[in-house]
């Protein structure tokens, strides 16, 4: 988390996020240069690319105004770390085959399932989580949610050992009837 402070002071954390949410409002070419220089120096540390260019971009592109206000300023300041939860033990990255379910219960959804090989999993505060809301619809049954990791029922598994990129954690994540409001849906259902 301390590295997020360093990158924020240098203007390199979520720099494509609009200024209205605390970002610099720059284009992706700036990020390409930043990440190219990180790679050139051999820095494989925390998953800044996932945090900045995947999670923040999902929220920026598909989030409601309330979701943007809730998460983007914290992500820019390094106060909230983002992660992308899609890969599952039996499905890999084949989203139409995922088993993590989100079942509607009144104004909420109840999420149960498991993810694996999730970068930033040990540190994340918010997860863009792929779930199945309709198991009969194949890929069209996949719905994304923003899951706050402080919610009851969320649990981090072990930090997985890897051959490389040891500075970036890769984790198992478990969701045991995690209740999220329908307003946590990112984009539309399916």
List PLM regions with ranges:
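Short Gly/Pro-enriched turn/cap motifs at secondary-structure boundaries
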Residues: 48, 75, 90-93, 117-120, ...
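A short, Trp-centered hydrophobic/proline-enriched beta-strand micro-motif
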Residues: 78-86
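Short Ser/Thr-interspersed hydrophobic loop/turn segments at strand-loop and sheet-helix junctions
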Residues: 11, 34-39, 131, 147-152, ...
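A structural signal for short hydrophobic beta-strand segments in well-ordered beta-sheet cores
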Residues: 100-103
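A short core secondary-structure module
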Residues: 112-156
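Internal helix-loop-helix
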Residues: 9-79, 119-126, 137-138
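A glycine-rich, basic-preceded beta-loop-alpha segment at the flavin cofactor/substrate interface
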Residues: 30, 149-160, 168-190
């Amino acid at each position: 988390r301390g590295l997020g402070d360093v990158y924020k002071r240098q203007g390199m954390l979520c720099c494509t996020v609009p200024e209205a949410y605390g970002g610099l409002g720059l284009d992706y070419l700036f990020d390409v240069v930043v990440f190219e220089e990180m790679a050139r120096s051999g820095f494989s540390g925390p998953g800044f690319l996932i945090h900045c260019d995947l999670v923040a971009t999902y929220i920026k592109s598909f989030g409601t105004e309330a979701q943007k206000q809730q998460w983007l300023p914290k992500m820019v300041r390094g106060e909230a770390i983002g992660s992308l939860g899609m890969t599952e033990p039996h499905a890999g990255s084949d989203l139409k085959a995922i088993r993590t379910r989100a079942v509607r219960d009144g104004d909420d959804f109840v999420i149960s399932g498991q993810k694996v090989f999730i970068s930033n999993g040990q540190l994340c505060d918010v997860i863009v989580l792929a779930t199945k809301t309709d198991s009969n619809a194949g890929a069209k049954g996949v719905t994304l949610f923003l899951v706050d990791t402080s919610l009851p029922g969320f649990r981090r598994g072990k930090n997985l050992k890897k051959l490389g990129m040891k500075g970036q954690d890769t984790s198992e994540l478990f969701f045991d009837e995690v209740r999220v409001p329908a307003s946590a849906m990112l984009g539309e259902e399916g």
